[in-house]
Amino acid sequence: MENKFEIGRIIRAKNISDAWYRGLNIIWNHGRVITDERGSQIKEFMDLMVVIENPYTDRIPADTAWNEERLEEYAKQLISGENIQDFEYTYGQRLRNWNGEVDQIEYVIEKLKESPTSRRATAVTWIPPVDTKVNEVPCMILDDFKIRDEKVHLTTLFRSHDFGGAYPANLYGLSKLLEYVAEKVGVEPGVITTVSISAHVYDHDWDMVENIVKGIN
């Protein structure tokens, strides 16, 4: 029997591993199967918010296919804006050289130094003149940094979020990015919150996810 359609849940997680396992559990047990515009079957839960209290410990879930070397490379590309593996684009390029014009991470750092309570330390990856005309578009859309209680916190919006394959790498990279920004600004890194409009797992990951969920329930 198909799950009743449901939108919106909040997870308060201790660390990245805890966030991943609990997110997979919600998607698997409360998501619905759809066929996406590319013809792939996914199991999807809409509007999943995950608040990670300490994203600096237990960053690599035991069951992920990502290892530390690959994760470090991913984080380096995110922070530096380099395209080490010759992708069509990287998040780092969009953050560091948006539309060939703006280093948004440098802007965020300077904005927070200038005005620690600013609500304008926001970086986006979507470029409408480009992304409305191509096949490969960013899943991570927005990164917002705020200093509160003497720490800089990060909220990230994903329009589409591959929880099975990409979430561990995304969060590892974001935790490193937040540490980088915090060091440059001169404050401690804080909480990371992700908002995933479409949190999903692809059909090729269903067996893996089912086994993981069985193991944690």
From Swiss-Prot:
The keyword Methyltransferase belongs to this UniProt entry's keyword annotation: yes
Transmembrane parts of this sequence: none
SUPFAM superfamilies cross-referenced by the UniProt entry: Thymidylate synthase/dCMP hydroxymethylase
E.C. number: 2.1.1.-
Domain of life according to the entry: Archaea
Regions annotated as coiled coil: none
Keyword tags: Cytoplasm, Methyltransferase, Nucleotide biosynthesis, Transferase
Gene Ontology biological process terms, A to Z: dTMP biosynthetic process; dTTP biosynthetic process; methylation
One term under GO cellular component: cytosol
Primary subcellular site in the record, as a coarse category: cytoplasm
Subcellular location: Cytoplasm
Pathway assigned to this chain's UniProt record: Pyrimidine metabolism; dTTP biosynthesis
InterPro entries found in the cross-reference section: Thymidate_synth/dCMP_Mease, Thymidate_synth/dCMP_Mease_dom, Thymidate_synth/dCMP_Mease_sf, Thymidylate_synthase_arc
Active site (UniProt): 139
Recorded GO MF terms: thymidylate synthase activity
Function: May catalyze the biosynthesis of dTMP using an unknown cosubstrate.
PANTHER family xrefs: THYMIDYLATE SYNTHASE 1
Self-association and partners: Monomer.
Family: Belongs to the thymidylate synthase family. Archaeal-type ThyA subfamily.
Designated name of the protein: Putative thymidylate synthase
The organism's taxonomic lineage, starting at the top: Archaea, Methanobacteriati, Methanobacteriota, Stenosarchaea group, Methanomicrobia
Gene: thyA
